[in-house]
Amino acid sequence: YLITEVYEKQLLATQSQVKYLQSQLNPHFQFNILAMLSLKAKMAGNEELYESLNAFSKLMQGKIFREKEIRIKVREELEIVQFYLFLQKERYQDKLTYEINIEDEQIKENLIPRLLIEPLVENAVSHGLEPKKESGIIRVCMYEENFIEENDEIKKQKKTSKILHIIVEDNGVGIDYEKMNEKPTEEVQQPEKIDHTHTGFENTRKMLQILYGDNYKFNIWSEKGKGTKIEIILPAERGEIPCGK
């Protein structure tokens, strides 16, 4: 029995290594093809097609080739968001408008989890604006706020630090509780902060829990037919990314 168990574990480990290597090979091929198509579009003078292919290539690079990086700078995450929104704007034309507002350029040097914002924006497009008949807007905004920490062990000792607010909101159809297999309470039916079990949101919350413990907030407000607002509050953290992080 023990020999069989060891063999099965070794087999699983080998399969995992093979799958990892395969996952590394396929993206390189795809990006080479994209680069070739982009170049052909550029040479043919088709600037619109060139920009779309280039944006898609950059989006995929940000999602796949940097998968080992846990945290990146805000400006790098925003580049991924902008590439995604550019492509969706090309797809939906006048149906989609978007705004990205950053209170201070220094905020772009903060470190945040990789792919923290982009999946929320993707969710806003897919589940908020896509089902909507009329045109819609997505807003991404970020600002910092001073936060006073009190040390209970040392009387009257206080420390001022900064916290980062990240907001993604849309004026789409709102959250569909039936598809989420949720029965909203009376409070949830109003445009109040809600608890949720949506898989995408839950994955984001789990990631934040792992990286920040209890030192974060993840809030959602939604009203059917009017839209959804997501707010993430994190410690503001600037600096270079440590090696291997």
Where do the language-model regions lie?
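Two-component histidine phosphotransfer core
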Residues: 1-221, 229, 233
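C-terminal end segment of the histidine kinase catalytic
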Residues: 222-245
